[in-house]
Amino acid sequence: MTVYSGSTNCEVTLGMNNARAPFNNKLVRQAVRQAINKKNLIKTAWSGYGLEIGSFVPPTDPWYEDLSTLYPYDVNKSKALLKSAGYANGLTINLDLPPIAYATNSGEFIAASLAKVGIKVNLKPIAWGEWIDRVFTKKDYDMTIVCHIESNDMAIYANPAYYFGYNSTTYQGLIKKAASAKTQAARVENLKKAARLLADDSVSDWLWLIPNLQVAKKTISGIPLNTVGDAYTVDRITVG
């Protein structure tokens, strides 16, 4: 048997509520990002399968840029950022975990990681109904984890009413320019700028990209590695 590992659109996202303290402070959001060792998280939560991406773009999109090293794991830097943000004595936040493996598998690791820099995390396992009502709709949360799988979905960060609570006129302008671009090159350039701005602002932390894992007999070839939607293409698969 052969194991095939490709990519998907599913960005496992550590959402931070930009609309209220403490995550209305960019320094705190950046501190969270630099407190989490993504490689070790992927090993712990997803058996080592997954791609660090650094922003809200999968590698199958033309505007993808590897931004995973923009804010690298650095405990001392994370502590310094919290001190600069006014949290030298630490802080306490809640992390809402919906009932799905990538979230529940990540909770303890993230809590332990943030504890090392002075952030106490109360883990809150919740049902999907509560997540949709309280977190997604009412935006009553501090942090949460969910996988965003929609194609070309960067526009959700351009909506201040969306549950991330991110309100950047610069970002909104880039998304509008991309949508009205007359050439593909112009669209790609504006979306690259938008993705970098998301990363620069540490709006969320993109923990990893869920891989497309498949197992097939060695006599089978032409397996499509990557998936960008619900369709599964079989016209190039051969046996023998």
Predicted ranges, named:
Residues 6-31, 44, 159-161, 175-176, ...:
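A bilobed periplasmic-binding-protein/Venus flytrap-type ligand-binding module shared by bacterial periplasmic
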Residues 19-28, 70-71, 88, 180-181:
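Short helix-loop capping/hinge motifs at secondary-structure junctions, enriched
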Residues 26, 75-94:
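Immediate post-signal peptide segment of exported/extracytoplasmic ligand-binding proteins
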Residues 33-63, 102-111, 132-240:
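Detector for C-terminal structural segments
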Residues 44-45, 68, 94-101:
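Short beta-strand->loop
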Residues 75-81, 97-110:
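Bilobed "Venus flytrap"/periplasmic-binding protein-like clamshell domains
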Residues 88-95, 112-126:
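A local structural motif
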Residues 99-101, 123-133:
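Short helix-initiation/N-cap motifs at beta->coil->alpha
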